[in-house]
């Protein structure tokens, strides 16, 4: 009993580890992540094919930009410049850098050996950082703690892992989202499964700490005026999403046991409403 109380009284940051992104990615084959569980809920067959390496994850420029913004906002300029190459090869016809989705840019980035972003993207990351730092509530959530902290634990009978954007020592989980229009955050949260993602984070962190963390999201617009908003996800909605996550994990166990991976569209569906 004393050990439980001692565990619950320690800051959340005591339970997260610093780990390179490549190391975390390499463990996806044997540890369940929130992203993988969301994918399984939507399409078990696609989940399985990706797990077997039959479908390669597409590394789109937008993903790199998102990671760059997270790094700049949460980990600072020095780490940002260490992890990302800034600039690009010049197109002799235009005198400007090749676009990030071009073959020339990809070859240049591959030769450098680390993710590359344009100067315009680097400038955008600076503007996003300033916007977040000027928001009092957002700043209070990331004033202390650890960025990109990893936690692993057995959850619902499966080895699981999470990588938290920011862990506050007392308040817990802080997730950073970039968005085109802040007014549509709630809609985007539903479309992209943010609640289920964060419920999974909360459950795995609670598994090792013995207490449930608070869950906040900082969302920042990627265009003028770079508005910033902070949302605290309620216990009720996280509990509901957690129950759906647990049900999905049980379905995942059945799929593994039977080696049966449906698409979810095997039966006739009814279309009986007007949009």
Regions found by a protein language model. Name each.
Residues 137-143, 168-173, 206-213:
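Secondary-structure boundary elements
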Residues 54-58, 110-117, 183-193, 234-236:
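Short histidine-centered catalytic/ligand-binding loop motif
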Residues 147, 162-187, 201:
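Conserved catalytic cores of phosphodiester-cleaving nucleases, focusing on short active-site segments
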Residues 157-161, 168-171, 212, 224-226:
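Coil-to-beta-strand transition motifs
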Residues 64, 161, 193-196, 200, ...:
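Short, well-structured alpha-helical interface segments that form or flank functional binding sites
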């Amino acid at each position: 009993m004393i050990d439980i109380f001692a565990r619950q009284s320690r800051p959340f940051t005591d339970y997260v580890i610093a780990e390179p992104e490549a190391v975390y990615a390499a463990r996806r084959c044997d540890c369940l992540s929130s992203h993988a569980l969301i994918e399984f809920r939507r399409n078990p067959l696609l989940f399985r094919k990706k797990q077997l390496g039959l479908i390669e994850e597409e590394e789109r420029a937008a993903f790199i930009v998102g990671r760059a913004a997270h790094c700049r906002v949460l980990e600072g300029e020095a780490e940002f410049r260490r992890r990302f190459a800034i600039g690009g090869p010049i197109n002799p016809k235009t005198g400007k850098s090749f676009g990030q989705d071009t073959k020339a840019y990809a070859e240049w980035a591959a030769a450098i050996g680390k993710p590359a972003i344009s100067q315009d993207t680097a400038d955008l990351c600076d503007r996003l950082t300033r916007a977040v730092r000027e928001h009092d509530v957002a700043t209070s959530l990331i004033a202390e703690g650890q960025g990109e902290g990893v936690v692993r634990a057995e959850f619902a009978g499966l080895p699981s892992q999470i990588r938290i954007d920011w862990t506050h020592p007392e308040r817990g989980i802080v997730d950073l989202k970039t968005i085109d229009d802040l007014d549509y955050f709630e809609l985007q949260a539903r479309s992209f499964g943010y609640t289920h993602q964060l419920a999974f984070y909360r459950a795995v962190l609670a598994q090792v700490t013995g207490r449930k963390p608070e869950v906040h999201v900082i969302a920042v617009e990627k265009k003028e005026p770079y508005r910033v908003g902070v949302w605290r996800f309620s216990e009720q909605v996280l509990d509901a999403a957690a129950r759906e996550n647990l049900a999905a994990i049980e379905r995942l166990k059945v799929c593994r046991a039977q080696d049966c991976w449906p698409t979810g569209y095997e039966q006739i569906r009814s279309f009986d409403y007007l949009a």
